[in-house]
Amino acid sequence: MDIAIQHPWFKRALGPFYPSRLFDQFFGEGLFEYDLLPFLSSTISPYYRQSLFRTVLDSGISEVRSDRDKFVIYLDVKHFSPEDLTVKVLEDFVEIHGKHNERQDDHGYISREFHRRYRLPSNVDQSALSCSLSADGMLTFSGPKVPSGMDAGHSERAIPVSREEKPSSAPSS
């Protein structure tokens, strides 16, 4: 099986229609020079085109789904263990915070931290919220919706993160 290996110089953004990785959720995976100067690098090789869809798919952006029966958030947190994650419900919001202290890896020392806040729909049953972390690092936060007119129960509380031994079945966009 042949695997194409691409030098980082060729993996740069080419202007306003090609998003930068600067604000993506690559928690500490490093930045290339084109992340800081995306327009400058496009003048070097004007005929090279980076795949827009590959950039979007690899960006690690969270996915929020809300249908008639349930509300679900998928978030890639592959660099964090359940002990590093805190999930809280504060009134109509869920706050997901991940932090691990400085530790050594192959390239030196690294520490990571992120904070995400999502608005919960008003009809989500907050007493039945759950959160799990799959073996491949996909955090799944979910809660059922109650029929309109019923009390969804809003309060402040922490949601424990359980670990699953199987990879995530989250749909890829």
UniProtKB/Swiss-Prot annotation:
It is found in: Cytoplasm; Nucleus. The modification N6-acetyllysine is found at K70, K99. Zn(2+) 2 binds at H107. Residues 144-173 are annotated as: Disordered. GO terms for biological process: lens development in camera-type eye; negative regulation of apoptotic process; protein refolding; response to heat. Acetylation at Lys-70 may increase chaperone activity. Undergoes age-dependent proteolytical cleavage at the C-terminus. It comes from the Eukaryota. Glycans are attached at S162. The modification Deamidated asparagine is found at N101, N123. Its main location: cytoplasm. InterPro entries: A-crystallin/Hsp20_dom, Alpha-crystallin/HSP_16, Alpha-crystallin/sHSP_animal, Alpha-crystallin_N, HSP20-like_chaperone. Keywords: Acetylation, Chaperone, Cytoplasm, Eye lens protein, Glycoprotein, Metal-binding, Methylation, Nucleus, Phosphoprotein, Zinc. Zn(2+) 1 binds at H100, E102. Residues 153-167 have a biased composition (Basic and acidic residues). GO terms for cellular component: cytoplasm; nucleus. Residues 1-63 are annotated as: Required for complex formation with BFSP1 and BFSP2. The modification N-acetylmethionine is found at M1. GO terms for molecular function: metal ion binding; structural constituent of eye lens; unfolded protein binding. The modification Deamidated glutamine is found at Q6, Q50. Zn(2+) 3 binds at H154. PANTHER family: ALPHA-CRYSTALLIN A CHAIN, HEAT SHOCK PROTEIN HSP-12.2-RELATED. Contributes to the transparency and refractive index of the lens. Acts as a chaperone, preventing aggregation of various proteins under a wide range of stress conditions. Required for the correct formation of lens intermediate filaments as part of a complex composed of BFSP1, BFSP2 and CRYAA. Heteromer composed of three CRYAA and one CRYAB subunits. Inter-subunit bridging via zinc ions enhances stability, which is crucial as there is no protein turn over in the lens. Can also form homodimers and homotetramers (dimers of dimers) which serve as the building blocks of homooligomers. Within homooligomers, the zinc-binding motif is created from residues of 3 different molecules. His-100 and Glu-102 from one molecule are ligands of the zinc ion, and His-107 and His-154 residues from additional molecules complete the site with tetrahedral coordination geometry. This is Alpha-crystallin A chain.
